């Protein structure tokens, strides 16, 4: 059986006490509280006085005992003083015991029923997420390359999943994928698929990319690690209200439009780069594009180059004003459409090869053969002087 008697001496509240109608209840409660406070103050004062007496008693007792031990002064008087002090100590013990008994009998009240164990308030806060590292562009690129090298296969597996439950389970098994690098990889993969005209596959990967971006955005809003938001996101997207679902689908459509636009831009950039490379390959010695130069020529000069008729070219240039002829022929030379003195260059190359052959076989020839060879070479040179080969048209020829 439970003993409730100890609760009878608790004086906590007067709110439920019945009072006479003619008595002002708030005033009565106030007087009672004031009397209680005064009793507590008197008790505290009495304890302080006993504490001071105890300190004085201890000091006097030690002092007298030291004098007796050192045999200083009247020993009889000191012993009487010691006896007197010891009697005072007994009286102090009696008074302290009485005070302790009174305190035990004093009913508890709102001021004495409890006291603070400590005056410190501690509020547990979630540890702040680590701030994004301040990386340079090169460091970010290197970090992305390392991530792709280590996780490309897993990223593609995630990108090919279709059901939300499968995606949730896969990410929970590979929490390292829940990061910004995975979203960036899926964006790049979507662009490449669109450039390859794999539109359906691009749309599927785009859906998975938006899921990852929503997880990262949810983590930012809650200020927690993204890995802690995987389950929350998939539960929310599967049980969401129609408005949230509509917003999610709208985000996917907008993302696919941006992917298509970016893929088209990259294709145009690639085509422009290819054309520029081809143009650089076509560039002549003077840095001009032969196709552009040909299109800028007058029709009569175009006809000469198309027919490859040198005589017609000479006649056409002869009929043109000198400054125009110089201008067009210089552009033809700079673009490589026309190589001046090409025949002389070819002739010089042939003669060099012939001399090399003669040098190689010179040791095997007899003096008669050398003379015959020399005679033939001189005749060939004389013939070349009498009938010069056409070496092409240059700006000097125009003058």
Curated annotation (Swiss-Prot):
InterPro entries: Cdc37, Cdc37_C, Cdc37_Hsp90-bd, Cdc37_Hsp90-bd_sf, Cdc37_N_dom. SMART domains: CDC37_C (SM01069), CDC37_M (SM01070), CDC37_N (SM01071). The keyword Cytoplasm applies. Residues 1-11, 367-388 have a biased composition (Basic and acidic residues). Keywords: Chaperone, Cytoplasm. GO terms for biological process: positive regulation of insulin receptor signaling pathway; positive regulation of neuroblast proliferation; protein folding; protein stabilization. One of its GO terms (cellular component) is cytoplasm. It is found in: Cytoplasm. The keyword Cytoplasm applies. Its main location: cytoplasm. Residues 1-26, 345-399 are annotated as: Disordered. GO terms for molecular function: heat shock protein binding; insulin receptor binding; protein kinase binding; protein-folding chaperone binding; unfolded protein binding. Forms a complex with Hsp90. Interacts with a number of kinases such as CDC2 and Sevenless. Co-chaperone that binds to numerous kinases and promotes their interaction with the Hsp90 complex, resulting in stabilization and promotion of their activity. Belongs to the CDC37 family. This is Hsp90 co-chaperone Cdc37. The lineage of its organism: Eukaryota, Metazoa, Ecdysozoa, Arthropoda, Hexapoda.
